[in-house]
């Protein structure tokens, strides 16, 4: 299944996103990692206007006045604030100039233990924030194994330890 999915990623309008609790990474085929920024947003509390996202919002962390708040829209590997996650995805795709594709295909890494409801929230964030035509979800340990070049279709077992900002996962992967 996963090999069929990865073989579908054939042009540079296909995007892979590691939507992490601490950082968000975006990868594009042929370009590699094109964005690695903190998963944080600064918002004006009076008019709900977003003032900064990613690195810029991170610089404001702990230095805000009462009318400005910093938000981490993901907690423990899952979406805690749908609207802010959508806005963060939109901002990051705009920043890498990939939001002008008509409707990219997006693959997103997800923690292994999340619920169907949480999976749906992540999918909807990619569809809304990323204007995706198709969204695929892949468990983080599997994505980590593929990312370091492990042949996950082989019968040989591999232990993967994926340590993130909000979750740590340990998995044994074999055909």
Name the predicted role of every residue range:
Residues 1-165, 171-175:
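Nucleotide/phosphate-binding catalytic cleft detector across ATP-hydrolyzing
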